[in-house]
Amino acid sequence: MKIAITITVVMLSICCSSASSDICPGFLQVLEALLMESESGYVASLKPFNPGSDLQNAGTQLKRLVDTLPQETRINIMKLTEKILTSPLCKQDLRF
């Protein structure tokens, strides 16, 4: 469960940072692929961004960790992400 929390916090901090008032749709597609698709589907979602081999390998390792989470947990992480991204609080500059 710690990995789920870590992944969620990292993704949400990127999505809700004051530097990114508009979220790249491609990023959200990659996030969804990370949580919901097969490893090959996730790797395919990265291709348009031309990650180097080191970055792609790191992403693949992350995907393998995410895949150890129960399906219900991954679905709930997607729901949590959507809830936060659509919240009025996400448009504010929150400091933790």
Swiss-Prot record:
Family: Belongs to the secretoglobin family.
Gene3D superfamilies per the UniProt record, alphabetical: Secretoglobin (1.10.210.10)
Signal peptide span: 1-21
Protein name: Uteroglobin
Keywords on record: Disulfide bond, Phospholipase A2 inhibitor, Secreted, Signal
GO cellular component: cytoplasm; extracellular space; nuclear envelope; secretory granule
Compartments where found: Secreted
UniProt GO BP: negative regulation of interleukin-13 production; negative regulation of interleukin-4 production; negative regulation of interleukin-5 production; negative regulation of T cell proliferation; negative regulation of transcription by RNA polymerase II; negative regulation of type II interferon production; regulation of inflammatory response; regulation of mRNA stability
Recorded GO MF terms: phospholipase A2 inhibitor activity; polychlorinated biphenyl binding
Coiled-coil ranges from the UniProt annotation: none
Oligomeric and partner information: Antiparallel homodimer; disulfide-linked. Interaction with LMBR1L is controversial.
Gene field: Scgb1a1
SMART domains the UniProt entry points to: UTG
Protein purpose: Binds phosphatidylcholine, phosphatidylinositol, polychlorinated biphenyls (PCB) and weakly progesterone, potent inhibitor of phospholipase A2.
Expression sites (tissue/organ): Club cells (nonciliated cells of the surface epithelium of the pulmonary airways).
Pfam families, alphabetized: Uteroglobin (PF01099)
Induction of synthesis: By glucocorticoids.
Coarse class of the protein's main subcellular location: secreted
